[in-house]
Amino acid sequence: MLQQDSNDDTEDVSLFDAEEETTNRPRKAKIRHPVASFFHLFFRVSAIIVCLLCELLSSSFITCMVTIILLLSCDFWAVKNVTGRLMVGLRWWNHIDEDGKSHWVFESRKESSQENKTVSEAESRIFWLGLIACSVLWVIFAFSALFSFTVKWLRRSRHIAQTGLKVLGSRDPPASAFQSAGITGVSRCPGHPSRKFHQVDINSFTRITDRALYWKPAPRLSSPPLRAAPGNCQQMAPARLFLSLRLWAWRGGGESPNSRGTGEPGPKFHLASGMH
Protein backbone atom coordinates (compact mmCIF):
# COMPACT_ATOMS: atom_id res chain seq x y z
CA MET A 1 0.00 0.00 0.00
CA LEU A 2 2.78 2.42 0.84
CA GLN A 3 4.54 1.65 -2.40
CA GLN A 4 1.33 2.12 -4.36
CA ASP A 5 0.66 5.44 -2.64
CA SER A 6 4.16 6.64 -3.43
CA ASN A 7 3.70 5.73 -7.08
CA ASP A 8 0.40 7.59 -7.19
CA ASP A 9 2.02 10.64 -5.67
CA THR A 10 4.76 10.49 -8.26
CA GLU A 11 2.33 10.32 -11.15
CA ASP A 12 0.14 13.13 -9.84
CA VAL A 13 2.96 15.62 -9.48
CA SER A 14 2.11 18.85 -11.24
CA LEU A 15 4.15 19.99 -14.18
CA PHE A 16 4.99 23.24 -12.45
CA ASP A 17 5.60 23.81 -8.74
CA ALA A 18 3.84 27.16 -8.77
CA GLU A 19 0.59 25.54 -9.83
CA GLU A 20 0.29 22.92 -7.08
CA GLU A 21 -1.91 25.19 -5.02
CA THR A 22 -4.48 25.40 -7.84
CA THR A 23 -5.01 21.66 -8.28
CA ASN A 24 -7.98 21.56 -5.91
CA ARG A 25 -9.81 24.51 -7.42
CA PRO A 26 -12.91 23.74 -9.46
CA ARG A 27 -13.03 24.45 -13.14
CA LYS A 28 -14.84 27.75 -13.62
CA ALA A 29 -15.62 29.92 -16.58
CA LYS A 30 -13.44 32.77 -15.37
CA ILE A 31 -10.00 33.96 -16.34
CA ARG A 32 -7.53 32.95 -13.63
CA HIS A 33 -4.42 34.11 -15.55
CA PRO A 34 -5.31 37.50 -17.03
CA VAL A 35 -1.71 38.49 -17.77
CA ALA A 36 -0.99 35.28 -19.67
CA SER A 37 -4.27 35.61 -21.58
CA PHE A 38 -3.46 39.20 -22.50
CA PHE A 39 -0.01 38.44 -23.89
CA HIS A 40 -1.31 35.33 -25.64
CA LEU A 41 -3.41 37.64 -27.84
CA PHE A 42 -1.21 40.73 -27.73
CA PHE A 43 1.78 39.47 -29.70
CA ARG A 44 -0.13 37.74 -32.50
CA VAL A 45 -2.75 40.46 -32.90
CA SER A 46 -0.04 43.14 -32.91
CA ALA A 47 1.79 41.29 -35.69
CA ILE A 48 -1.39 41.22 -37.80
CA ILE A 49 -2.01 44.94 -37.20
CA VAL A 50 1.56 45.80 -38.19
CA CYS A 51 1.17 43.72 -41.36
CA LEU A 52 -2.04 45.53 -42.32
CA LEU A 53 -0.88 49.05 -41.44
CA CYS A 54 2.76 48.70 -42.40
CA GLU A 55 2.60 51.10 -45.34
CA LEU A 56 0.97 53.72 -43.11
CA LEU A 57 3.30 53.27 -40.15
CA SER A 58 6.58 53.09 -42.04
CA SER A 59 7.79 53.14 -45.62
CA SER A 60 10.61 50.69 -44.89
CA PHE A 61 9.81 47.09 -45.73
CA ILE A 62 12.73 45.83 -43.63
CA THR A 63 11.45 47.63 -40.53
CA CYS A 64 8.01 46.08 -40.87
CA MET A 65 9.44 42.63 -41.52
CA VAL A 66 11.74 42.75 -38.49
CA THR A 67 8.91 44.03 -36.28
CA ILE A 68 6.60 41.18 -37.31
CA ILE A 69 9.35 38.60 -36.79
CA LEU A 70 10.09 39.92 -33.30
CA LEU A 71 6.42 39.94 -32.30
CA LEU A 72 5.82 36.40 -33.54
CA SER A 73 9.05 35.19 -31.94
CA CYS A 74 7.81 36.49 -28.60
CA ASP A 75 4.45 34.84 -29.28
CA PHE A 76 6.09 31.48 -29.98
CA TRP A 77 8.11 31.67 -26.78
CA ALA A 78 5.04 32.66 -24.75
CA VAL A 79 2.89 29.83 -26.16
CA LYS A 80 5.60 27.21 -25.61
CA ASN A 81 6.72 28.22 -22.13
CA VAL A 82 3.96 30.26 -20.46
CA THR A 83 0.47 30.40 -21.93
CA GLY A 84 0.35 26.77 -23.02
CA ARG A 85 1.03 25.40 -19.55
CA LEU A 86 -0.98 28.00 -17.62
CA MET A 87 -4.09 28.25 -19.79
CA VAL A 88 -4.56 24.68 -21.06
CA GLY A 89 -1.95 22.65 -19.15
CA LEU A 90 0.04 21.54 -22.20
CA ARG A 91 3.73 21.80 -22.91
CA TRP A 92 6.44 20.22 -25.05
CA TRP A 93 10.20 20.32 -25.42
CA ASN A 94 13.10 18.60 -27.13
CA HIS A 95 16.03 16.77 -25.61
CA ILE A 96 18.99 14.77 -26.92
CA ASP A 97 19.82 11.41 -25.37
CA GLU A 98 23.24 9.87 -24.77
CA ASP A 99 23.33 8.42 -28.29
CA GLY A 100 22.89 11.87 -29.82
CA LYS A 101 19.31 11.27 -30.98
CA SER A 102 16.74 14.05 -30.77
CA HIS A 103 13.46 13.29 -28.98
CA TRP A 104 10.30 15.39 -28.70
CA VAL A 105 8.43 15.18 -25.39
CA PHE A 106 4.75 16.18 -25.17
CA GLU A 107 3.02 16.38 -21.78
CA SER A 108 -0.28 17.47 -20.29
CA ARG A 109 -1.28 18.28 -16.73
CA LYS A 110 -3.01 15.37 -15.02
CA GLU A 111 -6.38 15.93 -13.38
CA SER A 112 -7.35 13.88 -10.35
CA SER A 113 -11.11 13.85 -10.92
CA GLN A 114 -13.86 15.42 -12.99
CA GLU A 115 -14.81 17.73 -10.12
CA ASN A 116 -11.31 19.11 -9.65
CA LYS A 117 -10.42 20.72 -12.94
CA THR A 118 -7.38 22.95 -13.25
CA VAL A 119 -8.17 24.45 -16.67
CA SER A 120 -10.57 27.33 -17.03
CA GLU A 121 -13.08 27.07 -19.85
CA ALA A 122 -12.75 30.76 -20.66
CA GLU A 123 -8.96 30.56 -20.86
CA SER A 124 -9.18 27.42 -22.97
CA ARG A 125 -11.45 29.18 -25.48
CA ILE A 126 -9.16 32.20 -25.61
CA PHE A 127 -6.11 30.02 -26.11
CA TRP A 128 -7.44 27.88 -28.96
CA LEU A 129 -9.33 30.70 -30.66
CA GLY A 130 -6.27 32.95 -30.72
CA LEU A 131 -3.97 30.13 -31.76
CA ILE A 132 -6.07 28.93 -34.71
CA ALA A 133 -7.76 32.13 -35.89
CA CYS A 134 -4.53 34.09 -36.28
CA SER A 135 -2.90 31.27 -38.23
CA VAL A 136 -5.90 31.17 -40.57
CA LEU A 137 -5.57 34.92 -41.10
CA TRP A 138 -1.95 34.52 -42.14
CA VAL A 139 -2.97 31.91 -44.69
CA ILE A 140 -5.63 34.29 -46.03
CA PHE A 141 -3.00 37.03 -46.30
CA ALA A 142 -0.78 34.67 -48.27
CA PHE A 143 -3.51 33.87 -50.82
CA SER A 144 -4.55 37.52 -51.10
CA ALA A 145 -0.95 38.52 -51.78
CA LEU A 146 -0.72 35.75 -54.37
CA PHE A 147 -3.77 36.90 -56.34
CA SER A 148 -2.85 40.58 -56.01
CA PHE A 149 0.73 39.88 -57.22
CA THR A 150 2.25 41.46 -54.13
CA VAL A 151 5.36 39.36 -54.07
CA LYS A 152 7.07 40.85 -51.03
CA TRP A 153 4.01 40.42 -48.80
CA LEU A 154 3.48 36.93 -50.17
CA ARG A 155 7.00 36.02 -49.14
CA ARG A 156 6.33 37.34 -45.65
CA SER A 157 3.03 35.49 -45.19
CA ARG A 158 4.42 32.29 -46.69
CA HIS A 159 7.33 32.16 -44.25
CA ILE A 160 5.03 32.81 -41.30
CA ALA A 161 2.37 30.27 -42.31
CA GLN A 162 4.79 27.46 -43.19
CA THR A 163 7.13 27.67 -40.22
CA GLY A 164 5.52 24.65 -38.57
CA LEU A 165 6.79 22.44 -41.38
CA LYS A 166 10.32 23.73 -40.84
CA VAL A 167 10.13 23.19 -37.10
CA LEU A 168 9.10 19.54 -37.43
CA GLY A 169 11.97 18.86 -39.81
CA SER A 170 14.71 20.77 -38.08
CA ARG A 171 17.10 19.33 -35.48
CA ASP A 172 17.53 22.52 -33.62
CA PRO A 173 14.17 24.59 -33.73
CA PRO A 174 14.91 28.29 -34.20
CA ALA A 175 13.47 30.93 -31.91
CA SER A 176 11.64 32.48 -34.88
CA ALA A 177 9.21 29.56 -35.23
CA PHE A 178 5.78 31.12 -35.30
CA GLN A 179 2.08 30.43 -35.61
CA SER A 180 1.83 26.91 -36.94
CA ALA A 181 4.68 25.79 -34.69
CA GLY A 182 2.53 26.49 -31.65
CA ILE A 183 -0.40 24.58 -33.12
CA THR A 184 1.84 21.64 -33.99
CA GLY A 185 3.44 21.39 -30.56
CA VAL A 186 0.29 21.84 -28.49
CA SER A 187 -1.84 19.53 -30.64
CA ARG A 188 0.58 16.64 -30.06
CA CYS A 189 0.25 16.80 -26.28
CA PRO A 190 -1.77 13.93 -24.76
CA GLY A 191 -4.46 16.19 -23.31
CA HIS A 192 -5.39 17.88 -26.57
CA PRO A 193 -9.13 17.41 -27.40
CA SER A 194 -8.46 16.36 -30.98
CA ARG A 195 -5.60 14.02 -30.11
CA LYS A 196 -7.41 11.10 -31.77
CA PHE A 197 -7.04 12.80 -35.15
CA HIS A 198 -3.24 12.89 -34.83
CA GLN A 199 -2.50 9.19 -35.16
CA VAL A 200 -0.44 9.65 -38.32
CA ASP A 201 3.12 8.43 -38.13
CA ILE A 202 4.87 11.70 -37.29
CA ASN A 203 8.29 10.10 -37.66
CA SER A 204 7.65 9.49 -41.36
CA PHE A 205 6.52 13.08 -41.75
CA THR A 206 9.64 14.28 -39.97
CA ARG A 207 11.85 12.24 -42.30
CA ILE A 208 10.10 13.80 -45.30
CA THR A 209 10.69 17.30 -43.97
CA ASP A 210 14.31 16.41 -43.22
CA ARG A 211 14.82 15.47 -46.84
CA ALA A 212 13.08 18.63 -48.01
CA LEU A 213 15.03 20.96 -45.72
CA TYR A 214 18.44 19.31 -45.77
CA TRP A 215 18.39 18.15 -49.38
CA LYS A 216 21.75 17.50 -50.97
CA PRO A 217 22.33 16.68 -54.63
CA ALA A 218 23.14 13.10 -55.39
CA PRO A 219 26.80 12.37 -56.18
CA ARG A 220 27.68 12.12 -59.83
CA LEU A 221 28.27 8.69 -61.24
CA SER A 222 31.89 8.60 -62.35
CA SER A 223 33.07 6.34 -65.13
CA PRO A 224 35.14 3.31 -64.09
CA PRO A 225 38.89 3.90 -64.07
CA LEU A 226 40.86 2.82 -67.11
CA ARG A 227 42.79 -0.36 -66.58
CA ALA A 228 46.15 0.61 -68.01
CA ALA A 229 49.55 -0.86 -67.37
CA PRO A 230 51.78 0.88 -64.82
CA GLY A 231 53.63 3.77 -66.43
CA ASN A 232 51.12 4.09 -69.25
CA CYS A 233 50.15 7.63 -70.25
CA GLN A 234 46.47 6.89 -69.64
CA GLN A 235 47.18 6.13 -65.99
CA MET A 236 49.26 9.25 -65.32
CA ALA A 237 47.80 12.50 -64.10
CA PRO A 238 47.73 15.36 -66.64
CA ALA A 239 50.25 17.49 -64.75
CA ARG A 240 52.62 14.60 -64.25
CA LEU A 241 52.27 13.56 -67.87
CA PHE A 242 53.07 17.10 -69.04
CA LEU A 243 56.19 17.33 -66.87
CA SER A 244 57.37 13.93 -68.06
CA LEU A 245 57.04 14.98 -71.71
CA ARG A 246 58.90 18.24 -71.07
CA LEU A 247 61.69 16.38 -69.31
CA TRP A 248 61.86 13.88 -72.15
CA ALA A 249 62.07 16.71 -74.70
CA TRP A 250 64.72 18.56 -72.70
CA ARG A 251 66.94 15.49 -72.49
CA GLY A 252 66.43 14.75 -76.15
CA GLY A 253 65.55 11.17 -75.40
CA GLY A 254 63.52 8.87 -77.51
CA GLU A 255 63.57 8.12 -81.17
CA SER A 256 62.00 10.12 -83.94
CA PRO A 257 59.32 8.48 -86.06
CA ASN A 258 61.65 8.53 -89.11
CA SER A 259 64.56 6.89 -87.28
CA ARG A 260 62.51 4.24 -85.49
CA GLY A 261 64.24 0.88 -85.76
CA THR A 262 67.56 2.34 -87.05
CA GLY A 263 69.06 3.05 -83.63
CA GLU A 264 69.65 6.75 -84.43
CA PRO A 265 68.50 9.24 -81.82
CA GLY A 266 65.82 11.68 -82.75
CA PRO A 267 66.16 15.46 -82.92
CA LYS A 268 66.87 17.25 -79.68
CA PHE A 269 64.39 19.74 -78.25
CA HIS A 270 65.22 22.68 -76.02
CA LEU A 271 63.16 24.63 -73.52
CA ALA A 272 64.17 28.01 -74.99
CA SER A 273 64.33 28.79 -78.67
CA GLY A 274 67.67 30.61 -78.29
CA MET A 275 69.52 27.61 -76.81
CA HIS A 276 71.55 25.35 -79.18
UniProtKB/Swiss-Prot annotation:
<feature type="modified residue" description="N-acetylmethionine">
    <location>
        <position position="1"/>
    </location>
</feature>
<keyword id="KW-0812">Transmembrane</keyword>
<feature type="transmembrane region" description="Helical">
    <location>
        <begin position="52"/>
        <end position="72"/>
    </location>
</feature>
<dbReference type="GO" id="GO:0009306">
    <property type="term" value="P:protein secretion"/>
</dbReference>
<dbReference type="GO" id="GO:0016192">
    <property type="term" value="P:vesicle-mediated transport"/>
</dbReference>
<dbReference type="InterPro" id="IPR008564">
    <property type="entry name" value="TVP23-like"/>
</dbReference>
<protein>
    <recommendedName>
        <fullName>Golgi apparatus membrane protein TVP23 homolog C</fullName>
    </recommendedName>
</protein>
<dbReference type="Pfam" id="PF05832">
    <property type="entry name" value="DUF846"/>
</dbReference>
<feature type="transmembrane region" description="Helical">
    <location>
        <begin position="126"/>
        <end position="146"/>
    </location>
</feature>
<feature type="region of interest" description="Disordered">
    <location>
        <begin position="254"/>
        <end position="276"/>
    </location>
</feature>
<keyword id="KW-1133">Transmembrane helix</keyword>
<keyword id="KW-0007">Acetylation</keyword>
<comment type="similarity">
    <text>Belongs to the TVP23 family.</text>
</comment>
<feature type="region of interest" description="Disordered">
    <location>
        <begin position="1"/>
        <end position="21"/>
    </location>
</feature>
<keyword id="KW-0472">Membrane</keyword>
<dbReference type="GO" id="GO:0000139">
    <property type="term" value="C:Golgi membrane"/>
</dbReference>
